[in-house]
Amino acid sequence: YASEHPAVECLSLRFKRSVYADQLELDELDPYIVVYRRLEEYLSARGENDRLELIRRCLYFKINKKLSRPPRGRAKSWQRLLFERLTRDWGWDERQLATLDSRSQWKVRQVGNERRALVNELTFSYRFLSEFARNLQITSSLSSRDLGVLGRRLYAAFERKAGKVEFINPGIAPDLAEDRLTLAQLPAQNDREEWQWAIYQGHLSTAECGDFAPLKRSRELIELLAWCHRNGVIDPGTRLTIHPGDSDLNDFELNNLLESLRQSFPLPLPPASEMALLRASAPAEVLLLVNVGIDPLKQHSQKNIHLTSKRTDSLNYSGIRENLVLTLDQVCLNSWNELLVSRWQGSGALLDCLSDY
């Protein structure tokens, strides 16, 4: 409609013309098909085949008739017959239908590919509408308010920025949880003195990790675990293999970290309210984690020396007044439902954390 303004032909008018012209094929008068035909006409004229394929997949998912499987009843429904004809016209083969019909089993890689197409389309459409409103000099407070809320909702859900945990599954698949994962800290590919954390499908040895592409990698452990939690990749039933690398991480600490994330940020998150999106984002829930994957007394424990002292202040521990707070990881959920991860390290970690917060 916006692209045709001001000479807009409404779908209702096209529908009436078809009826008065005695074009009464019920399949073509179905509201979903009427909308699809209009979009197909528009995108085909512009040569935008990728966008058209996305529209076709959306329509196929909406109708929810799995054509790669036999019908449940004896007779095929009219929707199934219609989509058998449409998918033949689109050139979809059995393999593509089977992939789409297995959407409930899609995991991170397939969901990530579909998400990229959706994000590109939603972002393009929002920018187009914003430009359309500016060109027409729309001054309605309601229109500008709606566009503002929509823009912030898209920004909160899809905009990438430093420290923000990417949400990859906006309803594309019902469950991304993996049965078996391997968590490993390995030397970075471009700098052997740097270490990175990575999460892999299945049970892998340290040597095998180099032969497979990880689902996700990150410099810091908490950023990676927060991503796994936010996207439901790890759930209580997931079995984890750990290769701690240069860290002091063990199974007990890892399980406690995951449980802390579950308790602090239970899923699914409630949607951000319109009122929250009209205001600047603000912290709603904060989780602070101390010395993740680090033994602050490692130089003593390696020698089998265990310090005991009445001076238990972790910032001024024992007779040597040692600062045991070496790192702080902060996970913050804000009022726009953005999950943000920050890290501080060194003797001034606590002061830096308080100052930045």
Descriptions of predicted regions:
Residues 1-357:
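Nucleotidyltransferase catalytic cores
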